[in-house]
Amino acid sequence: VSAGITTGALGLWPLRSFAASAGTYTVRKGDTLSGIAKQFGTSVQSLRYENGINGDLIRVGDVLQLPGGGGDMLTEVRRVSEPKRGGLRTWRYIVAHHSGVDTGNAEIYGNYHRNKVGMRNGLAYHFVIGNGSKSGDGEIEIGPRWDRQLNGGHVKSAEVNNHGVGICLVGNFQNGRPSPRQIAALTSLSGYLRELIPNRTKYAVHKEIDGRNHTVCPGRYFPTSQMHEKFPDEW
């Protein structure tokens, strides 16, 4: 795991996430949240978030919103970000990472960063994009560093941590490829951030910032060249 791996209780700052609704499901006798999550390829956490459920209690006849389907992946990102127009930190970079492990979500990584790595602000990244393991496939989770417009902790470079938005895709892309929904979410999020941030931004992956001798992040199977084609340097 790289400066790219995190986990954690995010302290006073709640995570926000959004996976576009795939429709609804009516609870039947014998259903459990974990069973419904498995059936629809999402997570219990995502079902709780979408439906405002605090525990595991569901009742026959309840109509649940299902995360992870088609639609606008950026609804919650826009809702959180639009009020910040004119008051954004001076961002100059957008940096893509992989988590380096097969499962996880922003809460897990935030706990690790806070409690094991000792990061006072928790989650090192500004956004985490799920792979269907502990959050929805393509689900964009908004970390407290974006919500509060705080510097990142995702690379060695102080300059890039101070002025770089860190986006982590859950998975180890040395061993396999990100899912199509993860790439769709990353592309949508990166495009929106470039439009939102008033000054010019440089698109990069972790190893391009800290050097290949330091990290392989985001892995050999991450589509680095394709992402650069979509987001050519503006410097």
List each model region and its residues.
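N-terminal export signals
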Residues: 1-19
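Extracellular LysM carbohydrate-binding repeats and other cell-envelope/extracellular binding modules
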Residues: 21-29, 35-75
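Extracytoplasmic
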Residues: 22, 42, 53, 89-91, ...
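Second-shell loop/turn segments in exported
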Residues: 32-36, 93-101, 171-180
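Extracytoplasmic/secreted envelope proteins and their assembly/folding machinery
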Residues: 33-34, 44, 106-110, 183, ...
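N-terminal post-signal-peptidase region of extra-cytosolic proteins
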Residues: 45-52, 78-79, 107-114
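Basic/polar, cationic surfaces and motifs that engage anionic cell-wall
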Residues: 70-90, 131-134, 139-142, 146, ...
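Short, conserved "active-site rim" segments that organize catalytic pockets and cofactor/ligand binding
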Residues: 82-148
